[in-house]
């Protein structure tokens, strides 16, 4: 007759810490050709800025060379950059949108 041993089930609980996603700044860069009204329109359409916020950001871009439109997780930031750059080209403006790690 064989011996049966007690089988212990040991569950190791591994706690994985959820890290917040890396965030990225979406930047609009100044140029000498894109009309200020178009920049305001971009900020309102793609970044949901009201007229005053859009105007303030546009003036920052105009005076400082670039301005932050928003801070987003990478996937969202990348999508916004692509959308803005496509919209600018479709409207024949050289406006450049880019991203930087926040």
Curated annotation (Swiss-Prot):
Highest taxon of source: Bacteria
GO biological process, one term: protein catabolic process
HAMAP family named in the record: ClpS (MF_00302)
Family note: Belongs to the ClpS family.
Assembly information from the UniProt record: Binds to the N-terminal domain of the chaperone ClpA.
Function of the molecule: Involved in the modulation of the specificity of the ClpAP-mediated ATP-dependent protein degradation.
UniProt protein name: ATP-dependent Clp protease adapter protein ClpS
